Structure formats: C-alpha cells, structure tokens
C-alpha cells in the first residue's frame, strides 16, 4: 500500500525552508499599476495592504510614494515573514509595518498600533489564495501538485480544521451544501455521494492527488469547461469550495468590507481585486449600498422592494450609500497582462471612494 504523506512533517519542512528573499518571491501582482493608480497614494498618507502576499502591490505603492506608510496584513506566516524582511530593508525601513492576522483580527491590531477609526487614506484587498500558496505543494491548495490536504491559509498558525478533517467528518448533506454554495458546483450531489462512498469504503482522503483522482473518477474525466468555456480540471470547483469553507473566506471578506468603511477617512480610497463571482458579489453589494445589518444583502438591489420596509433604520441602511465607485464598468486585465500572468485572467478590480 502506498505510504501516505505526513502533513505535519511536510509542514515543518516547509516552515524550515520558508526564508524566501522578498526580492525574488515567486509572485506577480495582478493589476498592480491600475490598483496603485486608483489608490492615489500621497506623501504622509497611511495605507493598508490587507492581503500582503509576496508584497508586490505594497512595493509598488512605496516606490511610487516614498513618503507614504503601509500597514501590511496577512494571515499567512510566510507572507508575514516576507513583510518583516521587507520592512527591515534599508529601502523600506520605517515605512512598512507588518501585521499577522485575518481581516477579523484587525480591530485588535488597530488598537495595538494606536490607530483611530476614519483615519486611513487607502485600503487594498487582493482576495483569494496567493501564488505562493498555490505553488507550495505542502500547503494543499493545488490540484496539480501532490501534498497534504491542508488548505489553511494561515498554515496552521491558529489551529483550525484542515480540508482533510472536513472530508473525514462532514455529513453528505452538508458537503452538498458546501459544494453548491462555495464552489457553485452543479454536480454537488454526485461528487458528495462519491466522496462519502470513498471515505467509507476505502480510506481517509489525505492528499490533494487523492481528492483530485477520486473526483476525476466520479466525473468520468479530468477536464470540463468553466464559465468562460476554458478547460478546467473536474475537481477545481470542489477544491475552491472546501478552501473557502476551511478559511471562512466569504465571512472574512464581508467583515473586511465593513472594516474598510469604519477605518477609511471620508474621501479615502478602496481598491479590491476579486477572482470569482462569490467574492465579487460581496464587494459589489457593499459598494452599491446593498447591505443589511452589516452584511451584503442576499438579494440584488433589483429584487429588493424598499416600499415594503417600514423600519426607518433598515430603510436608511438600504438607501444611504457609503461609497462612490470610481469607474463605470468593472476593470479586468488586458490581453498583455493575461499573457504574462495567466492567473490574472479571472481578476476583477473595483475602486471606490468613501463618501460618508
């Protein structure tokens, strides 16, 4: 029998060799120049890079505006180490402050650094996994690289369940919901049934290759077409769904948008980069003012009847917008950028200014 990979040992090996030089970090920032153009950094301004990754956007911002200051947040310890290394370099010393945590950790970090609400000049979100996370097999995000089925964006820094834990314990009905809600998977029932059968009859699913191979067998093939008619592995949506569930990504995105409204000053600028419709829908509804009780409304505005609401507070929250979008149509990479960096092909950028 093939010996299964040891996730703990591989994770320790990854941590030991994770001292990557920030100048050669394997990440090409998406829509970088456009993002910085919309942020419009000014001397003395304070900015938050909410998803530091390998630091491409932060580097460009600080190069464009040497007298600005950036707080660099990331939940990934490797990204945090890259931010620390960058902050200690002569070029960026005193201008870059690394922060380790999720979006929901920001209020605590804000207090620790003596920052006030309504004081920040700009915030940038580059949602989803970083290239570093996809490229490191030991992180468990990649279909094409075999590794332990982990998928935790924080690398286990704060504990939490792994993707393998989810698949070992989730009920079939709940797995169907996860695949439909977070992966927009039309074959959710078929895949969930097959995964539970494999779990019950064979073994605990512990590696990315095992999961990808099982789904390939369930779907009678390894590829199919995505929404844009591009070839995609039949396990792509399942990987996305489980990753989003493990990391509580959509709730974190929603909370990040709420925090942006609290932290930015009036006329402060927000730039977001999303990579699939679930992320973009949350961002779009916040910017359009379609928010109820601090959360993106489940219904688009065109399906919401304001005339049926008699609660003044709720009506005000629906009609009072906090953002003005800075462009008419969503911004996507041009053909040249997609050719240079294929991972940018599904990116969407939105930029807005805080109005109240």
Curated annotation (Swiss-Prot):
Which superkingdom, per the lineage? Answer: Eukaryota
* Function noted in UniProt: Probable S-adenosyl-L-methionine-dependent methyltransferase.
> Which residues are involved in binding S-adenosyl-L-methionine?
55-57, 74, 103, 126, 133
Q: Which UniProt keywords apply?
A: Methyltransferase, S-adenosyl-L-methionine, Transferase
Q: Which SUPFAM superfamilies match?
A: Putative methyltransferase TM0872, insert domain, S-adenosyl-L-methionine-dependent methyltransferases
Pfam families membership: Methyltransf_5
User: To which protein family does this belong?
Assistant: Belongs to the methyltransferase superfamily. RsmH family.
Keyword Metal-binding part of the UniProt annotation: no
Q: Which EC main class describes this enzyme? A: transferase
Query: GO CC annotations?
Result: mitochondrial matrix
- Please give the name of this protein: Probable methyltransferase-like protein 15 homolog
The disulfide bridges present are none
- GO MF annotation, one: rRNA (cytosine-N4-)-methyltransferase activity
Q: Which GO terms describe its biological process?
A: rRNA base methylation
Native organism taxonomy: Eukaryota, Metazoa, Ecdysozoa, Arthropoda, Hexapoda
Checking Gene3D superfamilies in the record gives: Putative methyltransferase TM0872, insert domain, Vaccinia Virus protein VP39
- Look up the EC number in the record and give it: 2.1.1.-
